[in-house]
């Protein structure tokens, strides 16, 4: 009924459409365009620069370890040292029902010079009650931390991430 050319063209258009839908859904809500909208292209481009400097990597990994300890905290706020952790304080999860945390933080990149810099991380955190029921959590999120050396100690001074 249709010439063979039109049949192939419709088939190719259908395949192209399905491929686009699948690839867009795979990106989730925080694809590259969402990151660019929130952070701007210049900051998103920072994530492509690999840091190989061992000193800078140690600073970043030490701060990531501190953040993981803070995110892994379960319980009330009693006995925590919130004053000494800078902007990482926002990652404390105070809930008396939480007895276990499943936290993952990956270093994306870092750059430091003249006592200031930034760290890009990708993280997720889930919190469970005594019955091992999820009570709170978030999927993977990218976060950019501004860092500064204050009184000889590297500190996260600002956290920027998509809400």
Report residues per predicted region.
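C-terminal motif of bacterial Sec signal peptides marking the signal peptidase cleavage site
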Residues: 23-26
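Core segments of small alpha/beta cavity-forming domains
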Residues: 31-106
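Surface-exposed, charged secondary-structure patches
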Residues: 93-135
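N-terminal hydrophobic targeting signals that begin at the initiator methionine
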Residues: 1-2, 28
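Short beta-strand edge/turn micro-motifs at domain boundaries
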Residues: 140-163
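Bacterial N-terminal signal peptides that target proteins for export
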Residues: 2-14
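Sec-dependent N-terminal signal peptides
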Residues: 14-20
């Amino acid at each position: 009924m249709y010439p063979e050319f039109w049949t192939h063209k419709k088939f190719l258009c259908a395949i192209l459409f399905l491929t686009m839908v699948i690839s867009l859904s795979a990106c989730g809500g925080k694809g590259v365009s969402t990151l660019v909208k929130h952070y701007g292209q210049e900051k998103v481009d920072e994530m492509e620069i690999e840091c190989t400097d061992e000193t800078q990597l140690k600073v970043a990994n030490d701060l990531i370890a501190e953040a993981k300890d803070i995110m892994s905290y379960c319980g009330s706020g009693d006995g925590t040292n919130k004053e000494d952790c800078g902007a990482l304080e926002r990652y404390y999860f105070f809930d008396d029902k939480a007895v276990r945390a499943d936290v993952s933080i990956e270093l994306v990149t870092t750059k430091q010079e003249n006592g200031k810099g930034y760290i890009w991380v990708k993280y997720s955190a889930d919190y469970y009650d005594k019955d091992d029921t999820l009570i709170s959590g978030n999927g993977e999120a990218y976060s950019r931390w501004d860092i500064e050396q204050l009184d000889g100690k590297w500190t996260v001074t600002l956290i920027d991430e998509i809400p």
